[in-house]
Amino acid sequence: MQANGAGGGGGGGGGGGGGGGGGGGQGQTPELACLSAQNGESSPSSSSSAGDLAHANGLLPSAPSAASNNSNSLNVNNGVPGGAAAASSATVAAASATTAASSSLATPELGSSLKKKKRLSQSDEDVIRLIGQHLNGLGLNQTVDLLMQESGCRLEHPSATKFRNHVMEGDWDKAENDLNELKPLVHSPHAIVVRGALEISQTLLGIIVRMKFLLLQQKYLEYLEDGKVLEALQVLRCELTPLKYNTERIHVLSGYLMCSHAEDLRAKAEWEGKGTASRSKLLDKLQTYLPPSVMLPPRRLQTLLRQAVELQRDRCLYHNTKLDNNLDSVSLLIDHVCSRRQFPCYTQQILTEHCNEVWFCKFSNDGTKLATGSKDTTVIIWQVDPDTHLLKLLKTLEGHAYGVSYIAWSPDDNYLVACGPDDCSELWLWNVQTGELRTKMSQSHEDSLTSVAWNPDGKRFVTGGQRGQFYQCDLDGNLLDSWEGVRVQCLWCLSDGKTVLASDTHQRIRGYNFEDLTDRNIVQEDHPIMSFTISKNGRLALLNVATQGVHLWDLQDRVLVRKYQGVTQGFYTIHSCFGGHNEDFIASGSEDHKVYIWHKRSELPIAELTGHTRTVNCVSWNPQIPSMMASASDDGTVRIWGPAPFIDHQNIEEECSSMDS
């Protein structure tokens, strides 16, 4: 506006100069023209001004400067007719030129930013889909929609989404139609590769039939629960039976027609009933037949996190707590690490009531008592305090003239059998509750009864020794069965109630069946087997082998799994044990006065416990208190091991030296 007055003066002074500039005589700078255009003081009201704007914005090819500009175009303030249009055109042209210039600068940056947007990798897309599925399960549907929109990913195939919704709504006809839409996706080669864990013999057509069968089965059960027997019968006859799949299951389904009420149906079918729970389970089964590119497996993120936590626990050398698959019980923000101070490698108590070498120790099955046998001819039963985990003397069982070298608790912990060394022909059966001797058994003065094991029924036990005796007896000491010529070193009864494992003088472990009187070789070593014990599941055997140490065998595959290092094992009988939660650990005494502890998967010891002054003959891990362990030694003491207290750190380091493997 103020520039227009200056333009008028310039025009009066000399129009030729303005013509030479091809528009410079308009007397308006580009900056002011842009400002005027932005303020709405001039607008492209003619076709020429619109064309100039189009040229400036690059929408049309550039045209040469107009030669018709003259001094008349400067008379906008002088009221000259037609001057306003020319001035307006010039103003817009200048503004457009400025806009074009700025656009030419901004456009490359915008294009560059678009080009710089990172393309998601396959793993990134997988993570986004996993997060989306998890959020969806939490009900954060809007968040999932925004996540998928911004990332450009797809949570699942649209046909799979329809299928899911129709299954959860119980719209079985539509769900069956959706299944037909999903058929090409199931038949794709990619689907075959992803489902590699399924049986190879399954044909693609068979997969569709199986999925359809599951759908119709749910439909049938829901009809029955609703009392629509005729509709259910129609599904059974006209839809399920023609599939010609799993006829045995169809016979079972037909039997549900006889159920008188819904509760009876749910009980017999082991089915939650019509609703979200049963349909969700159905959907989980159906998802296993679809490739993850179409529909993610159920709760996939939780599955991966659970696997990660389990792997960390497996790799933790000192993990000795109950395995909990609930992710809420652990922190996902840090790695799982157990402290060695939580491990039973600190002496909590020293029991000194025996007055000679202690040859054996064994916790009861319920973990409330400990029995120790000694050369001093006594068995002492100790009570475990459930709160302090300290032991106090409960009973002393006397009269074992040759000493006590082996003890076995009955399955119900009501009885205890004690054996002596090689030259002992007697066996004592004690009532633990009363402390009374129920049976003192001896078949012959020439017998050697050095080992004993209880049958799982608690009514029988087997015993034997190195002089060729191998008997099965009842609680009164009556002989039930016997094997001749078996020189027994150690015994164990398997959970089947029929098979007895026995190590003998031929450096082997054989299985003896007392029902059909058959036997078979299971383990063969190259050196004498001094003792052995079996894991709770009956799969693993832990052997103390003369001059070799501790060996772990797989009884099912009959292979040597691992040889544990560090222990000193000569020809003394040393008893090792499984222990800890899930029996992940192995402990053994040693002739170098130490107790060695290994993680089951590691050959090197994770702890060496010192304190005894002579050979450690036996170690027993409390089956109910994973942080408690007992060791018996020729030094006449029994040591109780537990976690370290929160003080006395120096003594902890001295008594528990650890080596990570």
From Swiss-Prot:
<dbReference type="GO" id="GO:0005739">
    <property type="term" value="C:mitochondrion"/>
</dbReference>
<dbReference type="InterPro" id="IPR036322">
    <property type="entry name" value="WD40_repeat_dom_sf"/>
</dbReference>
<feature type="region of interest" description="Disordered">
    <location>
        <begin position="1"/>
        <end position="70"/>
    </location>
</feature>
<feature type="repeat" description="WD 6">
    <location>
        <begin position="611"/>
        <end position="651"/>
    </location>
</feature>
<feature type="modified residue" description="Phosphoserine">
    <location>
        <position position="123"/>
    </location>
</feature>
<dbReference type="GO" id="GO:0043161">
    <property type="term" value="P:proteasome-mediated ubiquitin-dependent protein catabolic process"/>
</dbReference>
<feature type="repeat" description="WD 3">
    <location>
        <begin position="444"/>
        <end position="484"/>
    </location>
</feature>
<keyword id="KW-0991">Intellectual disability</keyword>
<protein>
    <recommendedName>
        <fullName>WD repeat-containing protein 26</fullName>
    </recommendedName>
</protein>
<dbReference type="GO" id="GO:0005829">
    <property type="term" value="C:cytosol"/>
</dbReference>
<feature type="domain" description="CTLH">
    <location>
        <begin position="156"/>
        <end position="231"/>
    </location>
</feature>
<keyword id="KW-0597">Phosphoprotein</keyword>
<comment type="function">
    <text>G-beta-like protein involved in cell signal transduction. Acts as a negative regulator in MAPK signaling pathway. Functions as a scaffolding protein to promote G beta:gamma-mediated PLCB2 plasma membrane translocation and subsequent activation in leukocytes. Core component of the CTLH E3 ubiquitin-protein ligase complex that selectively accepts ubiquitin from UBE2H and mediates ubiquitination and subsequent proteasomal degradation of the transcription factor HBP1.</text>
</comment>
<feature type="compositionally biased region" description="Low complexity">
    <location>
        <begin position="56"/>
        <end position="70"/>
    </location>
</feature>
<keyword id="KW-0496">Mitochondrion</keyword>
<dbReference type="InterPro" id="IPR051350">
    <property type="entry name" value="WD_repeat-ST_regulator"/>
</dbReference>
<keyword id="KW-0677">Repeat</keyword>
<dbReference type="InterPro" id="IPR054532">
    <property type="entry name" value="TPL_SMU1_LisH-like"/>
</dbReference>
<keyword id="KW-0853">WD repeat</keyword>
<feature type="repeat" description="WD 1">
    <location>
        <begin position="353"/>
        <end position="392"/>
    </location>
</feature>
<keyword id="KW-0539">Nucleus</keyword>
<feature type="modified residue" description="Phosphoserine">
    <location>
        <position position="121"/>
    </location>
</feature>
<dbReference type="GO" id="GO:0034657">
    <property type="term" value="C:GID complex"/>
</dbReference>
<dbReference type="Pfam" id="PF17814">
    <property type="entry name" value="LisH_TPL"/>
</dbReference>
<dbReference type="InterPro" id="IPR015943">
    <property type="entry name" value="WD40/YVTN_repeat-like_dom_sf"/>
</dbReference>
<comment type="subunit">
    <text>Forms homooligomers. Identified in the CTLH complex that contains GID4, RANBP9 and/or RANBP10, MKLN1, MAEA, RMND5A (or alternatively its paralog RMND5B), GID8, ARMC8, WDR26 and YPEL5. Within this complex, MAEA, RMND5A (or alternatively its paralog RMND5B), GID8, WDR26, and RANBP9 and/or RANBP10 form the catalytic core, while GID4, MKLN1, ARMC8 and YPEL5 have ancillary roles. Interacts with DDB1-CUL4A/B E3 ligase complexes. Forms a complex composed of at least WDR26, a G-beta:gamma unit, and PLCB2. Interacts with AXIN1.</text>
</comment>
<dbReference type="GO" id="GO:0000151">
    <property type="term" value="C:ubiquitin ligase complex"/>
</dbReference>
<dbReference type="InterPro" id="IPR006594">
    <property type="entry name" value="LisH"/>
</dbReference>
<dbReference type="InterPro" id="IPR006595">
    <property type="entry name" value="CTLH_C"/>
</dbReference>
<feature type="domain" description="LisH">
    <location>
        <begin position="123"/>
        <end position="155"/>
    </location>
</feature>
<dbReference type="GO" id="GO:0005654">
    <property type="term" value="C:nucleoplasm"/>
</dbReference>
<feature type="region of interest" description="Disordered">
    <location>
        <begin position="99"/>
        <end position="118"/>
    </location>
</feature>
<dbReference type="GO" id="GO:0005737">
    <property type="term" value="C:cytoplasm"/>
</dbReference>
<feature type="compositionally biased region" description="Low complexity">
    <location>
        <begin position="99"/>
        <end position="113"/>
    </location>
</feature>
<feature type="repeat" description="WD 4">
    <location>
        <begin position="524"/>
        <end position="563"/>
    </location>
</feature>
<dbReference type="GO" id="GO:0005634">
    <property type="term" value="C:nucleus"/>
</dbReference>
<dbReference type="InterPro" id="IPR001680">
    <property type="entry name" value="WD40_rpt"/>
</dbReference>
<keyword id="KW-0963">Cytoplasm</keyword>
<dbReference type="Pfam" id="PF00400">
    <property type="entry name" value="WD40"/>
</dbReference>
<feature type="repeat" description="WD 5">
    <location>
        <begin position="566"/>
        <end position="608"/>
    </location>
</feature>
<keyword id="KW-0225">Disease variant</keyword>
<feature type="repeat" description="WD 2">
    <location>
        <begin position="399"/>
        <end position="438"/>
    </location>
</feature>
